[in-house]
Amino acid sequence: MQSMTIFNIITQLVFLSKTLNGNLSVQPVFQTLDGYEYTSQSFSQNLQSESQLEIVYEWKYLDFLYSTFVQRQQSILNGDFVPKNNLPLGIDVHNNRLFVTTPRWKNGVPASLGTLPFPPKESSPAIKPYPNWEAHGNPNNPDCSKLMSVYRTAVDRCDRIWLIDSGIVNATINLNQICPPKIVVYDLKSDELIVRYNLEASHVKQDSLHSNIVVDIGEDCDDAHAIVSDVWRFGLLVYSLSKNRSWRVTNYNFYPDPFASDFNVYGLNFQWLDGVFGMSIYYNKKIMERVLYFHPMASFKEFMVPMNILLNESVWQTNTQEYAKYFIPIGDRGYNSQSSTSGVTRNGIMFFTQVHQDDIGCWDTSKPYTRAHLGKFHNMENSNLIQFPNDLKVDKEKDQNVWLISNRLPIFLYSNLDYGEVNFRILKANVNKIIRNSVCNPDNSYINTSKSAFVLIEEGQCF
């Protein structure tokens, strides 16, 4: 057990006393936490009034842009398009286009990747298949050179979009691997195919599900690596563009936490044993290296590993046990803080989804990963603006934005969506505006004290 300083004990007892007496009007005081000096303020009220989340698109159900009305009707009649079986999962942004993935969870999904214009011209547009209809295969007559079931994407600084195509259809009924999982890359300037790479069979386990992808660019655009998460068999696949080769990375921190595997949302109770999922890459000033921040979906913790460990292929061809020490936990978000995806801004602000809380959170990566340094934004009871935030991206604009897809996935999987109301949303917020009054603003010098003293003791002092 780590010892507590007398100052921290007194601070927490005073806070507990005021909390029990119902007196929450605490004047700002200066205190030191983890080597930083802060002004104690409750920042959550400021965030609620200035959340700055803006609805870009919303749908009761999805539609696709067919060449003619007759083609659309024919697709519905033959079962290729069943509107209620389509759900948006992944989001990405490049210039004046949004990219949305629609994996083939069920029958009747005609295309698994499409685009939408930005700025929007209407509130609920049909999705235009990307790059065209011909690029998408039919699961009833599979052509594995085509796109089958794209889960998520990554846009890099070289104007390319990277896709992870799971090759799995009907995952909600009977997991059917009809094509090998593959990485596909398109040139966003020409929309031409650049790369199609099937993951090596020896790296794909029984019931593997490859569901997320991030990309690291070195000194030039050829020095690129994609990192793909295997959420059901708890591994990472690293692909080298220059070598056109991949390797599998394993570590016990990729596994789900049983205590975080129980979900209770929207009146539904279910268990997800999803392993490593959320990933983002940034330069860590403390160790002076680029790192991969990651977390399993069924977890309350965040981890990191130096990128040079992941990108060294020879490490993963020998005894990997000696490298386990480089995969380290950096902090805990707290109970019911499961997160799917994350993204980091150019100045080191990480945003992450909070799927159990219908919210997004943030963290300034230059500060310790403790709950005192984690912010929330939406944080409003009885609001349906966000319902299961499933994917999140930070764009590459000069004035950056954070983008979010809310899609009610558990209801889609385990119950029935009400198609008389809005089920899916794409939302965005300007980064500078949304963090202005938050603990995540690097220019602010206060911490999150809007929780009980018991949480402060649990997270910061007694391990």
From Swiss-Prot:
Gene designation per UniProt: yellow-h
Coiled-coil parts of chain: none
Organism ancestry: Eukaryota, Metazoa, Ecdysozoa, Arthropoda, Hexapoda
Protein name: Dopaminechrome tautomerase
Provenance organism: Drosophila melanogaster
Reaction catalyzed: dopaminechrome = 5,6-dihydroxyindole
GO annotations of cellular component type: extracellular region
Enzyme Commission number(s) from the entry: 5.3.3.-
Recorded GO MF terms: dopaminechrome tautomerase activity
Known function: Catalyzes the conversion of dopaminechrome to 5,6-dihydroxyindole in the eumelanin biosynthetic pathway originating from dopamine. Catalyzes tautomerization of dopaminechrome to 5,6-dihydroxyindole during eumelanin biosynthesis. Acts both dopaminechrome and N-methyl dopaminechrome but not on dopachrome or other aminochromes tested.
